[in-house]
């Protein structure tokens, strides 16, 4: 799950990388955090789309049961 602390840390590492640079450990941490963040966003979008298509499909089937 994406927490505020995760977002804060991603932002902190990003700004530090632009100002003074990151250690190898920080670069690895930044990579892992970004990977986890992107993975969760993708899963969230997939769930939303699955729900959307399920709703659209469900609605579509109902339209055939009566005359418009």
Curated annotation (Swiss-Prot):
Keyword Cytoplasm: yes
InterPro entries referenced in this protein's UniProt entry, alphabetically: DUF896 (IPR009242)
Keyword Chloroplast part of the UniProt annotation: no
One CC-aspect GO term: cytoplasm
Keywords attached to this entry: Cytoplasm
Pfam family, one: DUF896
Subcellular compartments: Cytoplasm
Major location (coarse): cytoplasm
Similarity field: Belongs to the UPF0291 family.
Protein name: UPF0291 protein TTE2340
Organism annotation: Caldanaerobacter subterraneus subsp. tengcongensis (strain DSM 15242 / JCM 11007 / NBRC 100824 / MB4) (Thermoanaerobacter tengcongensis)
Organism placement in taxonomy: Bacteria, Bacillati, Bacillota, Clostridia, Thermoanaerobacterales
